[in-house]
Amino acid sequence: MRKGAIGIGTLIVFIAMVLVAAVAAGVIIGTAGYLQQKAQAAGRQTTQEVASGIKIVNVFGYINATPPSNGTIVKMAILVTPNAGSSGIDLSNVKIVLSDGKRLAVYNYSGVLYTGKILDLFNLTIWKNTSNGTFSIAVVNDVGSKMENHHPTLEWGDTVALLLRTDDVFEYEGKGGIGPSTKIIGKVIPDAGAAGVIDFTTPPTFGYNVLELQ
């Protein structure tokens, strides 16, 4: 009788252990599933962040002097296009950050957009409305016709020139603008996705009025 009671007790303990193990396994499996889903979601978000964003095609500078060697870069045009995985980028939320190592400037969208023919980019009338600390937009290619003044949207296949003045921010030897042999770094920062990187050094001498800087 006593042996039977011990056997039943052992069986009860064994069943309890099995139940506890089953519950623990269920918790572990549930937690693992949750963590896997969370990791997948984070991976998708990271992939989207890396794939989307702005790509800088070229950076051009303009020197309003004759000969150019006597002047400084007073205007800049940054040609951009979206990265391959980008959804629409609202350019009204974009910030342009530039630094020459002495000062750092942040440019915001001016609300001015140009969609006509571009025969002389640095002499368009749009520059009259491009003031201190702002950038305007000249549309080079608008595939989906989503470019409008208030919320110009940059989509796959589009190219625009972001136009800004440098003579009201930077200075070289008493003259407004960016001088020769000057290191410039910066970014074109969208509200979501990767920023376009600006990184160039101006030539030691300016031989032309329009220079390709990057």
Swiss-Prot record:
MF (Gene Ontology): structural molecule activity
Cellular-component GO terms for this entry: archaeal-type flagellum
Localization: Archaeal flagellum
InterPro entries per record: Flagellin/pilin_N_arc, Flagellin_arc
Alphabetical list of NCBIfam families matching this protein: arch_flag_Nterm, PRK08541.1
Function: Flagellin is the subunit protein which polymerizes to form the filaments of archaeal flagella.
Protein known as: Flagellin B4
Organism: Pyrococcus horikoshii (strain ATCC 700860 / DSM 12428 / JCM 9974 / NBRC 100139 / OT-3)
GN (gene name): flaB4
